[in-house]
Amino acid sequence: MPASPGAGSGRVAMSTNKVIEYNSTETDAILIKSETISDDINAMSLSKGELTVKGGMTSHAAVIARGMGIPCIVGARNVVFKEKEKILILDDGNVISEGDEITIDGSTGAIYLEKVKLRPPETTTTFSTLLQWAGEFCDIQIRANADTV
């Protein structure tokens, strides 16, 4: 289930310590867990995306990922997660192991078994004009998620 929009690529990390290890070598990580807990917050902030087997739109992983602006897929119930073996078996039989490069799309829930070249979103001139008008004519200001801008 898509839970936080955007896409992220990196090496699969199935523990908080593995994300931290990858980060120390400037390697992008995708955190995969059965579910996240508050102890995972550091790894979540360092990862380029998250995938959990359990959870829904109001689960810990989904709420934290949206707040941090990190792509996230939750409730991937059609997969088999073998935590001890550090593998994730997809419904089509493909196996993702810790260290594999993958890409996740938090907008659609898609998992790609390779590192997909990503590009940052483009700001159109129409959107820029709309923001300019809003700035000129607004009587109030709205501030939200300043840490993700």
PLM regions with names:
Residues M1-A29, S34-V149:
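Acidic, glycine-rich flexible loop/linker segments
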